[in-house]
Amino acid sequence: MKASQYNSSLRKKVLIFAAALVLLIALVFELYPRSSQIIDLSTGSGLSRMLRYDDAQVYICGEIHRKVEYQKFRNVLFKYLVEKKGVRVLLMEHGYASGFIENETIQNRMTFSDAFDQFTISQEDYELFRWMSEFNRNRPDNDKISIVGADITDSIEMLCTFCKYLLKDCDFSAADRKTQMLLIGIQKCRLQQRFQNSLLPQLIEQMQTQPEQLEIVLGDKMIHLERALLGWQQELTCNELNDYQAELQFGGKAMAYREDALYANLRRIYQENPTAKYFGSFGAAHVQMTRYVGDGTVHWIDNCFVSRMAGEESFLDGKLTVIDGDVTHEIGNLDESDTNHIILYN
């Protein structure tokens, strides 16, 4: 009888232990972010569980360019990061000049009608920039969203717009006559070909040989011209390394050169403002931490700038959350469907 009671008691204890173990495992899986999360693009539901690192300072998201569903997701994600995580810097995958003009717009120093058509490619872009502009209105400078172009991919149209805008309201009278004539020519230039083939090369030469004359005119704005022209020259070098093909070749010298430039630019941006929180939106191939094959193509960049930012020697020291580029291949398949749910793999 005692043996029977003992066995019955032991079975109860085993069952209680097993039940407790199952409950514990269920809680772990429920509370810890899983390998896939469902994100509702219309409400942002699920975003908080996706972003598992509360102490992250830089969030980098992969994308498929010009996909409507991706852009909706990006907008929801960015607004969430601004409102809940304190992100205040948007890193864009284009050159310094483009980022500068975009930033002037959302700071409400430049009207949307002046330049927005040059860098807006969709309604979703327009809505995001309008939202940032309204968010910044009447806020102190240290709480405003800013935009920085981190890439080396400015168009000649945007660089011309940038130069004209930078020279607006400048006094040329203290510079020498050669500099005055060059800057007046840029201000009045209406032909893109003339700017690209004549005025821009002269401006680059002036920056290299007589930068002090430009600084007399630009003052504190000189740093913006230096960075925009450096990015343009890097873009020319990249095009040359790519044999002037329209698309960069995976595994080629041009791709490696661009990744080096992106990493260096992001390191400089971060080091100039090391306490800010950042969100970056870049092509999926730059962001992927694992190989992905879609449509028979390997979407992967060896030694991409994001993998270096996530590495042990990174200037970020572990303060990075990567939203893998794989997610946007999933979104890309939905851009003609009625659903606003995607599955995020992280």
Question: Which residues are covered by each model-predicted region?
Answer:
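N-terminal secretory signal peptides that target proteins for export/translocation
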Residues: 1-7
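Membrane-interface helix-boundary signature
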Residues: 8-12
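Compositional signal for N-terminal targeting/processing segments
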Residues: 2, 13, 17, 26-346
